[in-house]
């Protein structure tokens, strides 16, 4: 049977990396790609048998390409720290590798869990990202600062697994806000060279809310769907607002040193 490496990206994910690693203990090799965590993430993964590789963060595309280089098996299964493989996906993958897989790369459905429920709307199911199961050498990632793309290096089309993994994107609303801030900063880099205004930032934010809440049917998930849509408004608004800020000269006025005036 062909061998498989599972790689996990993690940065200060001490609360999540244990469960993620335990969900792929069936793999022939587990590689955790860490970017200088200070909360014990690497130590937790290593204690479970993972090989921890330190890679400086130069964008997610570069990070994932470095992860591929670190894997030694025939096939690679990509997992993020907030994702969990399921028994059904494990069995489906091992069944594929026991035979002759039809495709060289497969996308994997994800069921995302937030605010106590599986999110079915908001574009969150099947919520495919880049192919998560692929033969080593069959693809590489592109180098966008955020939401990195991929390039297939095979003549075969992309396959799809039948079963879904779990994703737990936000531990709580505080983490949602923190991630929105981080990703809006990375997204602002992608807008370099584009003319934006605060009005366009607001317009893009409103469209992001409507797209997720109405057109992607976020409303079917109650308040969780509203929070997701509002979070997309915030992330999109601040992405454009930060780009606008970068293009302005908003230096504060000079302040002269103030000393006590001498009395005559």
Question: What annotation goes with each model-predicted range?
Answer:
Residues 42-70:
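Conserved donor nucleotide-binding strand/loop of the catalytic core
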Residues 76:
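Short aromatic/hydrophobic "clamp" motif used to bind/position activated sugar donors
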Residues 3-5:
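Cell-envelope/extracellular polymer assembly enzymes that use nucleotide-activated donors
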Residues 62-68, 86-250, 257, 263-264:
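Catalytic-site signature of metal-activated, phosphate-bearing donor transferases
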Residues 7-29:
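Short, well-formed alpha-helical segments that are part of the catalytic scaffolds
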Residues 23, 34-44, 80:
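A conserved acidic beta->alpha catalytic loop
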């Amino acid at each position: 049977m062909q061998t498989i490496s599972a790689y996990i990206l993690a940065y200060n994910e001490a609360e999540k990396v244990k469960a993620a690693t335990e969900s792929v203990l069936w793999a022939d090799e587990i590689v955790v790609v860490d970017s200088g965590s200070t909360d014990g993430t690497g130590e937790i993964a290593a204690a479970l048998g993972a090989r921890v590789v330190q890679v400086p963060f130069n964008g997610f595309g570069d990070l994932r390409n470095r992860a591929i280089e670190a894997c030694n098996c025939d096939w690679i299964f990509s997992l993020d720290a907030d994702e969990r493989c399921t028994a059904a996906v494990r069995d489906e993958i091992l069944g594929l590798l026991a035979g002759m897989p039809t495709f060289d790369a497969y996308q994997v459905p994800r069921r995302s869990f937030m605010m106590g429920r599986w999110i079915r709307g908001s574009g969150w199911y099947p919520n495919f990202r880049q192919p998560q199961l692929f033969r080593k050498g069959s693809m590489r990632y592109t180098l966008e600062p955020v939401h990195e793309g991929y390039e297939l290096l095979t003549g075969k089309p992309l396959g799809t697994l039948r079963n879904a993994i779990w994703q737990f994107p936000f531990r709580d609303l505080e983490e949602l806000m923190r991630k929105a801030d981080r990703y809006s900063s990375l997204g602002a880099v992608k807008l370099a060279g584009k003319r934006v205004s605060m009005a366009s930032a607001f317009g893009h934010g409103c469209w992001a809310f409507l797209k997720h809440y109405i057109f992607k049917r976020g409303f079917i998930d109650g308040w969780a769907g509203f929070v997701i849509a509002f979070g997309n408004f915030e992330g999109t608004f601040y992405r454009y607002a930060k780009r606008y800020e970068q293009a302005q000269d908003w230096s504060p006025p000079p302040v002269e040193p103030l000393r006590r005036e001498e009395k005559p």
